[in-house]
Amino acid sequence: ADIVNDVWALRQPGTAQVVARHPACGICLMHMHRDPQTMQSAPMEGDAVLQVLSFLKRAALDLQALGVNRQRIVLDYGIGFGKTVEQNFALLARQDELLAMGYPLLAGWSRKSSLGAVTGLDVDQRLIPSVTAALLAVERGAHVVRVHDVRETVQALAVWKAMRSEGL
């Protein structure tokens, strides 16, 4: 394996053993409020950014306490996993606060319902909103973006990078 994608961020039994069996791979820790069955029916309350920040910081430190080098850790703020539309957009707007922890950040906005909420588009029509969100996440410092439409996102990022390097 190249990466362990832990959507439970060490909250499931056996996770530490899986990580230990793969000492050369990266570990992505994602924030998910509650569990898949209840996360959307009872989303987070209050300042989601501060709660996600605290949760991910604790999970990353717990992983390091197990002997995992911090350079192997990537954090994912878990768009759509128990958060309201407003909270999801607040996480993007305040992504710099998450980056201040010093870990690479993954943003997974592709086809998310929050994009549908602001555009009115069905999931299979969210290409442009998804690419737009990926570009904004990268511009705001995300190191990795999780996408469905790889070719289109790569093309958009190439144009964005060229425009930034030329000062346009």
Question: Which sequence ranges carry the predicted segments?
Answer:
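Active-site-adjacent loop and "lid" segments of alpha/beta metabolic enzymes
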Residues: D2-D62, L66, G82-L168
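Short acidic capping loops at alpha-helix termini that bridge into adjacent secondary structure
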Residues: N69-R72
